[in-house]
């Protein structure tokens, strides 16, 4: 009777909604249903999955693969067609994309992917593709989410994911390491990474003498160009070509060693890289600000925090040390984000720093304008910190102050916003050499804009400065 009742409840429930980005593999798709993720498989996929299940279970234990279990039989009736097996997974709190990761984060994901490939190969399995979107982060720890891309290894098979790995991991990393160009805008514009053919055009003659660059990027790009420019090219049957297992392993190991050694020029001072040391705050004022954040977290007890303009994460750590369980930081400075990511790795805190240009947040895009969801669809928290943030939009980029306030208050139902007046040295620097057109930029206008969107529950003037911290609770 209990099973019949459960079956009726399931039948009456809303149909599962396919995750918009899950459409490329017809053998299995991913659905969002209530508070979980469901993954369907056809019979062929179910057989392959069963063969790898023991290996996958060990990866779950190691924290390298999202957990899975068989969905209750009653859930099968929610799907049409020949579904052989349905898995359920815990719902990830946050989905992030490679064009939001820092250089350090993308590098960690690349090394994670390669190590996973190497370990699977030792056990007779491999990954069927190399998309970076199959990696997600819990704090700074990468984890794998696509169970059906773990396949039995066939002796001598080619690595069909090589081009994808290079364009979604290697080339974006080289773009920064070689040319000090960040990957974010290029990657987001293309979605599938940075094309090798485009990267090759940036290389000088001396780069052609690099064996690794030539073998992994230059030669494949030239061969691809040759194939597309000729109407008929006899390349032979790819099924007849073989890549011995030892050669496959050596290729993966070479890439791992190469990427491990990639670095950025930390000697190039970026706009906010030295902010923590060179801002207009005194140590006492900074401590006062941290104490205010600590008191806010202790009183309101937010489980999750979004830190806008996080820099290297100081105030995210204050929140985590005072009761918050998870913090996601956003900044547009690449050096600060790399330092923040490395700090998260070293401390093992649940803190993930991500790239965000708040003037132009990640949009919903891709197939049907839904394949990759936008910032506002994916990121929300119990509380938001917007410390030394609003003036960068309102003054540096001419975004109306009221709109800045409205945007920040939509990120979380409560939080702290710091107002930085024109008299502050930082704003004075921003206005130096340009006309001051911001007649309505003042604390009265800020407070009025905030009161239209939320209730101000506390305000605090930082001693020795003209900056004011506002605690708000959004009006629902």
Residue ranges and their predicted role:
Residues 326-331:
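Conserved SAM-binding motif I beta-strand of class I
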Residues 126, 131-177:
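Catalytic activation segment of kinase domains across protein kinase-like and atypical kinase folds
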Residues 341-378:
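S-adenosyl-L-methionine
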Residues 407, 411-421:
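Conserved beta-strand signature within the Rossmann-like core of class I S-adenosyl-L-methionine
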Residues 392-408:
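A short, conserved alpha-helix within the catalytic core of class I
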Residues 384-385:
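A conserved beta-strand element that flanks and buttresses the S-adenosyl-L-methionine
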Residues 312-324:
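Conserved SAM-binding loop of SAM-dependent methyltransferases across substrates and taxa
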Residues 302-311:
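Conserved class I S-adenosyl-L-methionine
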